[in-house]
């Protein structure tokens, strides 16, 4: 059975993918610090909280059991266009990449899968992206990467992400390809109800309060002394 170590776990998207692909796996551990994500993850995947290795910067690598697959989507805040774009450097959230890399280097599983924002492949971060590929290749892996959009895989969401699949050279058959797009059959109109519950409509009093509030905002915006 496939043995999995999950880093920067969140609520376990990779685990859900394995489940949907009917791939049996044994979780050797996961690393997550957000208390709500931890509770959600354990409930969704029926995992005891003592499987959580906690803060990735404090993990004792020597105590991690051997595993076959490493999944990690290190923080994107310093890469994302919505963040400060400081890049992957120590001291930043995205710099936690190096913590994941240390585990990969020490354990050398058969397969590593990294997920992150598309902006990692942009001109601004090209050098850092190439460094990641070089780092992993020097550990004895072949890298395969591609930017995929969720909407092309039957998910009603326009979300682009880069996936880096790294396969250890001694087991790589050099035939890995990313999956072909899947038609998106579920549309917004399929989710909308023909009849809407009255609770979703504003009452006459509610409409009046909204108009009054908007009028006040409009008046404030027209005030030349507003700061």
PLM-predicted stretches and their roles:
Residues 58-61, 150-155:
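A short acidic, often aromatic-flanked loop/helix-cap motif at beta-alpha or helix-coil junctions
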Residues 32, 115, 160-161:
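Acidic-residue sensor for enzyme active/binding pockets
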Residues 110-114:
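Conserved beta-strand signature within the Rossmann-like core of class I S-adenosyl-L-methionine
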Residues 53-54, 118, 140-152:
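Conserved S-adenosyl-L-methionine
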Residues 66, 156-161:
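A short, glycine/Asx- and small/polar-enriched loop/turn
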Residues 1-27, 135-139, 161-227:
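S-adenosyl-L-methionine-dependent DNA methyltransferase catalytic core
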Residues 71, 145-147, 161-165:
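Conserved hydrophobic/aromatic beta-strand scaffold that supports enzyme active sites
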Residues 2-108, 118-122, 126-130, 137:
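Core alpha/beta nucleotide-donor-binding catalytic domains of modification enzymes
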């Amino acid at each position: 059975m496939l043995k999995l170590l999950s880093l920067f776990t969140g609520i376990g998207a990779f685990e859900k993918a394995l489940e949907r692909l009917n791939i049996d796996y044994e979780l050797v551990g996961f690393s997550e610090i957000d208390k709500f994500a931890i509770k959600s993850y354990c409930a969704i995947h029926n995992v005891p909280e003592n499987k959580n290795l906690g803060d990735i910067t404090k993990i004792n690598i020597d105590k991690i059991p051997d595993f076959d697959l490493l999944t990690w989507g290190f923080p994107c805040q310093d890469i994302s266009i919505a963040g400060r774009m400081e890049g992957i450097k120590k001291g930043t959230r995205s710099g936690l990449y190096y913590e994941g890399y240390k585990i990969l280097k020490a354990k050398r599983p058969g397969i590593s899968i990294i997920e992150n924002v598309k902006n990692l492949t942009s001109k601004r971060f090209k050098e850092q992206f190439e460094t990641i590929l070089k780092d992993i290749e020097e550990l004895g892996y072949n890298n395969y990467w591609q930017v995929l959009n969720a909407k092309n895989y039957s998910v009603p969401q326009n979300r682009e992400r880069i996936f880096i699949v790294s396969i250890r050279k001694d087991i790589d058959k050099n035939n890995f390809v990313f999956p072909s797009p899947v038609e998106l059959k579920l549309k917004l109109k399929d989710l909308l109800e023909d009849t809407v519950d009255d609770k979703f409509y504003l009452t006459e009093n509610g409409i009046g309060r909204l108009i009054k509030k908007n009028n006040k905002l409009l008046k404030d915006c027209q005030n030349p002394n507003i700061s």
